[in-house]
Protein backbone atom coordinates (compact mmCIF):
# COMPACT_ATOMS: atom_id res chain seq x y z
CA UNK A 1 0.00 0.00 0.00
CA UNK A 2 1.40 3.39 -1.03
CA UNK A 3 0.19 6.81 0.10
CA UNK A 4 0.34 10.09 -1.78
CA UNK A 5 -0.20 13.65 -0.60
CA UNK A 6 -2.35 15.26 -3.29
CA UNK A 7 -2.17 18.94 -4.13
CA UNK A 8 -3.57 21.36 -6.69
CA UNK A 9 -1.91 23.62 -9.20
CA UNK A 10 -4.44 25.44 -11.34
CA UNK A 11 -7.26 22.96 -12.01
CA UNK A 12 -4.95 19.92 -11.99
CA UNK A 13 -4.34 17.42 -9.21
CA UNK A 14 -0.84 16.18 -8.46
CA UNK A 15 0.55 13.78 -5.91
CA UNK A 16 3.86 13.06 -4.17
CA UNK A 17 4.78 10.11 -1.99
CA UNK A 18 3.79 10.87 1.60
CA UNK A 19 7.22 9.68 2.78
CA UNK A 20 8.85 12.54 0.82
CA UNK A 21 6.87 15.23 2.64
CA UNK A 22 8.42 16.41 5.90
CA UNK A 23 5.65 18.87 6.67
CA UNK A 24 2.98 21.11 5.19
CA UNK A 25 2.92 24.74 6.28
CA UNK A 26 1.02 27.94 5.55
CA UNK A 27 2.94 30.57 3.62
CA UNK A 28 5.12 32.65 5.93
CA UNK A 29 6.94 35.81 4.86
CA UNK A 30 9.37 34.82 2.11
CA UNK A 31 12.69 36.65 1.83
CA UNK A 32 13.62 37.37 -1.78
CA UNK A 33 17.11 36.40 -2.87
CA UNK A 34 19.02 38.47 -5.44
CA UNK A 35 19.89 36.87 -8.78
CA UNK A 36 17.85 33.75 -8.01
CA UNK A 37 16.29 31.81 -10.89
CA UNK A 38 12.70 32.90 -11.62
CA UNK A 39 11.18 29.72 -10.16
CA UNK A 40 12.80 30.45 -6.76
CA UNK A 41 10.46 32.68 -4.76
CA UNK A 42 13.06 33.15 -2.01
CA UNK A 43 13.97 31.60 1.32
CA UNK A 44 12.32 31.10 4.69
CA UNK A 45 13.58 30.37 8.18
CA UNK A 46 11.97 27.12 9.31
CA UNK A 47 12.86 26.70 12.98
CA UNK A 48 16.46 27.78 12.40
CA UNK A 49 16.94 26.12 9.01
CA UNK A 50 17.13 28.23 5.86
CA UNK A 51 14.86 26.61 3.27
CA UNK A 52 14.71 27.67 -0.40
CA UNK A 53 11.15 28.10 -1.67
CA UNK A 54 10.26 27.01 -5.20
CA UNK A 55 7.08 28.03 -7.01
CA UNK A 56 5.72 24.87 -8.63
CA UNK A 57 3.50 27.08 -10.81
CA UNK A 58 6.61 28.70 -12.30
CA UNK A 59 8.47 25.38 -12.42
CA UNK A 60 5.64 23.82 -14.45
CA UNK A 61 5.23 26.88 -16.70
CA UNK A 62 1.81 27.87 -15.35
CA UNK A 63 0.55 31.42 -14.99
CA UNK A 64 1.20 33.00 -11.62
CA UNK A 65 -1.65 33.78 -9.26
CA UNK A 66 -1.97 35.52 -5.93
CA UNK A 67 -1.49 33.26 -2.94
CA UNK A 68 -4.63 32.81 -0.86
CA UNK A 69 -5.72 31.10 2.36
CA UNK A 70 -5.52 27.69 0.64
CA UNK A 71 -1.91 28.12 -0.55
CA UNK A 72 0.60 25.88 1.20
CA UNK A 73 4.27 24.99 1.18
CA UNK A 74 5.15 21.31 0.93
CA UNK A 75 8.47 20.96 2.74
CA UNK A 76 10.29 17.99 1.25
CA UNK A 77 13.76 16.54 1.46
CA UNK A 78 15.32 16.76 -2.00
CA UNK A 79 18.89 15.58 -2.47
CA UNK A 80 19.41 15.49 1.30
CA UNK A 81 18.29 19.11 1.74
CA UNK A 82 14.99 20.62 2.79
CA UNK A 83 13.19 22.45 0.02
CA UNK A 84 9.77 24.11 0.09
CA UNK A 85 7.38 23.95 -2.85
CA UNK A 86 4.46 26.39 -3.07
CA UNK A 87 1.19 24.77 -4.20
CA UNK A 88 -2.31 26.21 -4.60
CA UNK A 89 -3.81 23.80 -2.06
CA UNK A 90 -3.15 20.47 -0.37
CA UNK A 91 -6.24 18.32 -0.79
CA UNK A 92 -5.88 14.88 0.80
CA UNK A 93 -3.80 11.79 1.49
CA UNK A 94 -4.64 9.01 -0.97
CA UNK A 95 -4.03 5.30 -0.34
CA UNK A 96 -3.13 3.30 -3.43
CA UNK A 97 -2.46 -0.28 -4.32
CA UNK A 98 0.94 -0.71 -5.97
CA UNK A 99 -0.46 -1.37 -9.46
CA UNK A 100 -2.74 1.65 -9.65
CA UNK A 101 -0.07 4.06 -10.94
CA UNK A 102 0.25 3.97 -14.73
CA UNK A 103 3.24 5.40 -16.61
CA UNK A 104 2.59 8.83 -18.13
CA UNK A 105 2.02 8.92 -21.89
CA UNK A 106 5.26 9.71 -23.75
CA UNK A 107 3.94 13.03 -25.10
CA UNK A 108 3.14 14.15 -21.55
CA UNK A 109 6.41 13.02 -20.02
CA UNK A 110 8.81 14.66 -22.48
CA UNK A 111 10.38 18.06 -21.93
CA UNK A 112 12.33 19.58 -19.05
CA UNK A 113 9.45 20.45 -16.70
CA UNK A 114 7.77 17.11 -17.32
CA UNK A 115 10.86 15.07 -16.41
CA UNK A 116 9.56 14.94 -12.84
CA UNK A 117 6.22 13.33 -13.82
CA UNK A 118 6.39 9.61 -13.05
CA UNK A 119 2.85 8.36 -13.42
CA UNK A 120 -0.87 8.93 -13.66
CA UNK A 121 -3.71 7.65 -11.45
CA UNK A 122 -7.42 7.49 -12.12
CA UNK A 123 -8.75 9.19 -9.00
CA UNK A 124 -12.50 9.46 -8.98
CA UNK A 125 -13.60 11.68 -11.85
CA UNK A 126 -10.17 13.03 -12.71
CA UNK A 127 -6.58 12.05 -13.35
CA UNK A 128 -3.93 12.67 -10.71
CA UNK A 129 -0.36 13.25 -11.92
CA UNK A 130 2.34 11.63 -9.78
CA UNK A 131 5.46 13.76 -9.27
CA UNK A 132 8.92 12.57 -8.19
CA UNK A 133 10.31 15.14 -5.70
CA UNK A 134 13.91 14.21 -6.49
CA UNK A 135 13.36 15.33 -10.09
CA UNK A 136 11.55 18.60 -9.35
CA UNK A 137 14.75 20.59 -9.52
CA UNK A 138 16.70 18.46 -12.00
CA UNK A 139 19.86 20.16 -13.23
CA UNK A 140 18.81 23.40 -11.55
CA UNK A 141 19.30 22.02 -8.00
CA UNK A 142 22.83 23.28 -7.44
CA UNK A 143 21.93 26.84 -8.42
CA UNK A 144 18.99 26.87 -6.02
CA UNK A 145 21.10 25.88 -3.04
CA UNK A 146 23.99 28.14 -4.02
CA UNK A 147 21.56 31.08 -4.09
CA UNK A 148 20.02 30.11 -0.72
CA UNK A 149 23.38 29.72 1.03
What are these regions (language model features)?
Residues 1-149:
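An acidic, low-aromatic, low-complexity terminal/linker signal
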Amino acid sequence: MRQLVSFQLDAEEYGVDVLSVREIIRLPAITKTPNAPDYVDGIINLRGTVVPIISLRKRFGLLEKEHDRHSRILVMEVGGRLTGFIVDAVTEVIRLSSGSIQPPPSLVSSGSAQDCLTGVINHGEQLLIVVEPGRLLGDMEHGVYDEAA
